Amino acid sequence: MSTSLNYKSFSKEQQTMDNLEKQLICPICLEMFTKPVVILPCQHNLCRKCASDIFQASNPYLPTRGGTTVASGGRFRCPSCRHEVVLDRHGVYGLQRNLLVENIIDIYKQESTRPEKKLDQPMCEEHEEERINIYCLNCEVPTCSLCKVFGAHKDCQVAPLTHVFQRQKSELSDGIAVLVGSNDRVQGVISQLEDTCKTIEECCRKQKQDLCEKFDHLYSILEERKTEMTQAITRTQEEKLEHVRTLIRKYSDHLENVSKLVESGIQFMDEPEMAVFLQNAKTLLQKITEASKAFQMEKIEQGYEIMNNFTVNLNREEKIIREIDFSREEEDEDDEGEVDEEGEGEDAVEVEEAENVQVASSGEEETLEKAAEPSELAAEIQAASGPLLASSPDSVSSLPPAADVLVTQGEVVPTDSQQTTQSETSGPSAAETADPLFYPSWYKGQSRKMISNPPHTPGGEGLSQIGPSAAEDSSVQSAEVAEAAANEQAAVSGKESSSTAATSQIGFEASSPQGQAAALGSGGGADSEPARHVFSFSWLNSLNE
């Protein structure tokens, strides 16, 4: 405890000496006063040499001898308070010396040159003759042995000063090291923050530059557009003004000509001689008539001078400009997601179109296979009727030539007419050019209707089908096959000759007008009544070849 007091007293003495030294500094040379020290009327002190220098500087025209002023009298200002000091005939030597300050300077110099006192071993405050040699662990203060035996620390735990000194010194060293390390880390963080500040400034400067460039680009676009639109208005203005000025010149010329003609007429009206008047009146009247008829007053349409077509509405653009803002990362991500969704949607549409094309192609193949079945059926019937044709060649030769036919649902359609239907030509069909006994009028009408309005079959556009829906195809074809087989058996057994078959067929086709009318009625109402099955034997002609 006494050690701390001694340290405090020493520190206080040092502070007192420092304050005293500040008071002993000359305001001119800024050093400690040198003897002799003079006191001014304002109670400030100066070195006599400094006072002489400042006096000489204030009075440069006074003669000097050996660095001192010879002439008497003069004045100068105090450097501390700027008070004017008036000197008598003795000059600066007439100022009084400050002996007190000189004595204080001597004492200060003696004390400052004295060697410093070494601090002795601290003594106990309660026992002045006892040195402090132990440390109380409970009270955490150094003390003496008598305090431990008889004094206030007799019930406390104590330890030698050396052990406690080493322990606390090591703790203090560790604490200092921790502080130094933390200071290093803090300094590193400060450096990083300074770098971050520089980076922020650089990025902001770059962004400002980019923003200014973009706005300058917008300004240039606006200026360019403004110039173009202004030029358009100017061109229209010049055109309209030129047109109006042309009309003005035209009307002015006409007015001038008419005025001259009127003046001539008025002068001619004063002609006293009737003969002269009549001689020239016809010519003048003709000129007046021509002038009144030839001139056509061209008027400017109403609103010609109004330029409403150049009105500009910038409300939408102004709204867009006011909504200009910085782009955000979320908006960019949303835009990328929309683009990805659009790409996936397009891929899905392409896949679906490819599947539809495959389905359509498979449907066309199935339809072509179904269309080939009647052709195969006709070939079988033709092969089976060979013996019948061999037994009656005359009847075959008597038959008129006809085109090959294709047995379809409800009717016999020539293959030539099928090709005609696909190409949509206007030429006559085989049914129209054949014998009327073989092809009655109602069949020709139906064939013509079939050619002009071919029914649409999905997947098989080249096929001609008239009659019930495709669901009834199988039943109708099976009935045709059964009937053809029965006719074939009858022909082979000889129950009917070929001529009789041909005659009956011709008779069947050449029916009464009532039958034809009924057939036409049935052809007209194909939606409500199934078509008749008509078989032609024109395929017999091919066997002669």
Swiss-Prot record:
InterPro entries membership: COS_domain, E3_ligase_FN3/SPRY, Znf-RING_euk, Znf_B-box, Znf_RING, Znf_RING/FYVE/PHD, Znf_RING_CS
Keyword Coiled coil found: yes
Catalytic activity: S-ubiquitinyl-[E2 ubiquitin-conjugating enzyme]-L-cysteine + [acceptor protein]-L-lysine = [E2 ubiquitin-conjugating enzyme]-L-cysteine + N(6)-ubiquitinyl-[acceptor protein]-L-lysine
Subcellular location as annotated: Nucleus; Cytoplasm
GO molecular function terms listed in the Swiss-Prot or TrEMBL record: identical protein binding; protein-macromolecule adaptor activity; ubiquitin protein ligase activity; zinc ion binding
UniProt region (Disordered), positions on chain: 324-378, 406-528
Compositionally biased region (Acidic residues): 328-355
Biased composition, class Low complexity, residue ranges: 417-426, 469-493, 510-520
Compositionally skewed regions (Polar residues) per UniProt: 495-506
CDD domains for this protein: Bbox2_MuRF2_C-II (cd19832), RING-HC_MuRF2 (cd16760)
Domain of life: Eukaryota
Amino-acid positions noted as binding Zn(2+) in the UniProt annotation, renumbered to this chain: 124, 127, 147, 153
EC numbers on record: 2.3.2.27
Coiled-coil portions: 219-258
Zn finger spans (B box-type): 119-161
GO CC aspect terms: cytoplasm; nucleus
PTM comment text: Targeted for degradation through the proteasomal and lysosomal pathways in the presence of SUMO3.
Residue ranges annotated for the COS domain, each copy included: 269-327
Keywords: Coiled coil, Cytoplasm, Metal-binding, Muscle protein, Nucleus, Transferase, Zinc, Zinc-finger
Statement: the UniProt record of this protein carries the keyword Repeat: no
Chain ranges of zinc fingers (RING-type): 26-82
Main location as per UniProt: nucleus
Function per UniProt: E3 ubiquitin ligase that plays an important role in regulating cardiac development and contractility, muscle growth, metabolism, and fiber-type differentiation. Acts as a critical factor that regulates cardiomyocyte size during development in concert with TRIM63 by regulating E2F1-mediated gene expression. Plays a role in apoptosis induction in cardiomyocytes by promoting ubiquitination of the DUSP1 phosphatase. Promotes non-canonical NF-kappa-B signaling and B-cell-mediated immune responses by mediating NFKB2 'Lys-48'-linked ubiquitination and processing.
PANTHER family (alphabetical): E3 UBIQUITIN-PROTEIN LIGASE TRIM36-RELATED (PTHR24099), TRIPARTITE MOTIF CONTAINING 55 (PTHR24099:SF17)
Subunit structure as annotated in this protein's UniProt entry: Homooligomer and heterooligomer. Interacts with titin/TTN. Interacts with myosins. Interacts with SQSTM1 and NBR1. Probably interacts with TRIM63 and TRIM54.
Protein name, entry field: Tripartite motif-containing protein 55
Organism: Rattus norvegicus
Gene encoding the protein: Trim55
